[in-house]
Amino acid sequence: MEDKNIKDDEILDDQNDNQEDVQNQDEEKEIKPKKPKKKVYISDDENAEEIKKRIESLKNKNNNISFRVKPPIFFFLILILMSTLFYFYGNKTALFQEKREISYTQFVTKVKQGDITEIRESQEKLTGIKKVAGKVEVFETNKLTDRLGQDTYLMEISKEKNVNIVVLGTPVSSIITRAIFSFAPLFMLLFFFYFINKKMMGSSGGVIGNPFNIGKGKGKISERPNVKFSDVAGLTEEKEELKEIVEFLKNPARFEKAGARVPKGVLLLGEPGTGKTLLAKAVAGESEAAFFPISGSEFIELYVGVGASRVRELFKDAKKEAPAIIFIDEIDAVGRRRGQNKNGGGGNEEREQTLNQLLVEMDGFDTDQRIIVMAATNRSDVLDPALLRGGRFDRRIEVSRPDVKGRIEILKVHSRNKKLASDVKLEDIAKITPGFVGADLENLLNEAAILAARKNSDEITMEDLDEAVDKVGMGLGQKSKIISKRDKDMLAYHEGGHALAATLIPGANKVHKVTIIPRGDAGGYMMPLPEETLGKTRKQILAEINVLFAGRAGEELMMDDIATGAYSDIKRATELAKLLISSVGMSELGPINYEHSDNGFMLSSDLSNETAREIDLEVRKLLKFKYEETLNLLRDNKETLEKIATLLKEKETVTGSEIRALVSGSSVNEVLELDDEQLEKYY
């Protein structure tokens, strides 16, 4: 009885072990440490009922266990299991018979000796079977020929020895294997596309990844923009024009009473960074309208008809959210003039279909729907005329570069969250940044803040701003770059020549700063302080040519040699000379414009060979005369040029006030001793 109890307990422990192994396969079950086996001696009379209950409990737990296997893993496990079963089914003799791999020569010898009574031919092997006294021996070798019937020698021996020959069919395992390997690439490809599709749907909200939504618009309903007109500085006239759009979206009845029709479309024209997108957001923010931003290139896709479908979807969504503003950035990507590509092409046809749909949609909504289409581009010359006619983009607003006043306002807006030192004068920064747009000025202040942070300062100083202007305008300074004495002298005379000519020649721009510190691609540079005018006069253009030539003239005069550093100066001087002669008619050839005409397809010249030769001669004559004139000017002021070069080699960076002090007669030492207040009178 005691042995029986021990045996029952061991069975119970084994069941516990099996149960624990099953539980370990369940990912969601807590893994418990395996307890050591213990032999418990109990009496059969007292504990028989308890043992039955424990066994029943274990059975119930086994029934409740569920195997949670991920579908892809489960699929592959089933596939492997089926392949294994088919393999063993097709080769069942391999499970129960011992095989001996022998050579072909040994195989033939055994047939001769009568050791093989049956030969079985498969696809790649010959299997010889010998049955003696109920025992079976199996010999296997590789086939010498594709088919056994082609092996005449072995066939003759087999016939003599009365060997039974059996040709086996293709094993089931081979069929399954072939099927698996045939269809596996297809299934893998389908699984790959399914996986990529799920990923794209997850990352794009189902719009891009779902092939049934391929035509849905990519424009997203933005939260009501919190940008106001007060956040847009330097664009006074542009904001005044757009205030009418805001009033229409907020109070359309006012315009309807007067019988006025508000423009359906507003086209913002301007160079990159001038604030076109910011203006569109400000209109939406002021009018509290839904904002649908989209790029023109997002309409064009690989599939034909997708662009037109997205246009329809975009306008459909906008009508649901009215009042709404649809903003198409870089509209020239989809709104180019039709018919220019004479070679055809699917991409061009798709773009034209998209443009046609856009034109139809802009005609299809009424003004009472309170939907405004705004677009931005810097290539208005390539837009299709149908876009610009009345009833579509019939209001065009030029967003120009800001003037000095506008730049001051922009700097004030972008410096709201920055701490400026007491010496900072934003007016001075605005004066030395002509041509900078809002994006450039924002970047300038950000660079200045980074420079201040490098010095562990929480204030931006005027020095930081001045360095940021150079970095944004010319590139990173290379103060650690080693320059030979000869190169330093050449740079000093080159930049000194520019500065001297700009100071002496009437009509030239004032000098703001001169430096011989390499920055970007330039070995040094002279920064002018140009006056902002509506246009340039002939005198100003000629003075600029003189200043450009002064660098090369300074090298030739003081070093008796010239360098390649004047390449960009000569190129710019040649462009100005051609502008003067062939474009604006300010030469002896008369007020005639000789520019090439653009017929929309290719550039073609209307000039005769004789006229082109006259223009070339006139350009050469003008440039040669201006260079000689500049060389004579520097020769007459050689001592002043030497002083400027000496000061540049001493300080590396010289202000315009110091240059003007040297030209007025001060020595280098006197200028070095001047303080800021004393230099102020030379500003």
Swiss-Prot record:
Residues at the active site: 495
SMART domains per record: AAA
Stretches with biased composition (Acidic residues): 10-28
Residues given in the record as ATP binding sites: 270-277
UniProt-listed GO biological process terms: protein catabolic process; proteolysis
Matches recorded under Pfam families: AAA, AAA_lid_3, FtsH_ext, Peptidase_M41
Cytoplasmic topology ranges: 1-70, 196-683
Membrane topology (UniProt): Multi-pass membrane protein
GO molecular function term, any single one: metalloendopeptidase activity
Entry's cofactor comment: Binds 1 zinc ion per subunit.
Top-level taxon of the source organism: Bacteria
Amino acids binding Zn(2+): 494, 498, 569
EC number of the protein: 3.4.24.-
Membrane spanning residue stretches: 71-91, 175-195
Cellular location(s): Cell inner membrane
Essential cofactor(s): Zn(2+)
GO CC annotations on file: plasma membrane
Region Disordered, annotated ranges: 1-43
InterPro entries referenced in this protein's UniProt entry, alphabetically: AAA+_ATPase (IPR003593), AAA_lid_3 (IPR041569), ATPase_AAA_core (IPR003959), ATPase_AAA_CS (IPR003960), FtsH (IPR005936), P-loop_NTPase (IPR027417), Pept_M41_FtsH_extracell (IPR011546), Peptidase_M41 (IPR000642)
Chain ranges on the Periplasmic side, renumbered to this chain: 92-174
Keywords: ATP-binding, Cell inner membrane, Cell membrane, Hydrolase, Membrane, Metal-binding, Metalloprotease, Nucleotide-binding, Protease, Transmembrane, Transmembrane helix, Zinc
Subunit structure, interactors included: Homohexamer.
Function of the protein: Acts as a processive, ATP-dependent zinc metallopeptidase for both cytoplasmic and membrane proteins. Plays a role in the quality control of integral membrane proteins.
Family: In the central section; belongs to the AAA ATPase family. In the C-terminal section; belongs to the peptidase M41 family.
Classification via HAMAP family: FtsH
Protein name, as recorded: ATP-dependent zinc metalloprotease FtsH
Upper lineage: Bacteria, Fusobacteriati, Fusobacteriota, Fusobacteriia, Fusobacteriales
Gene, per the UniProt record: ftsH
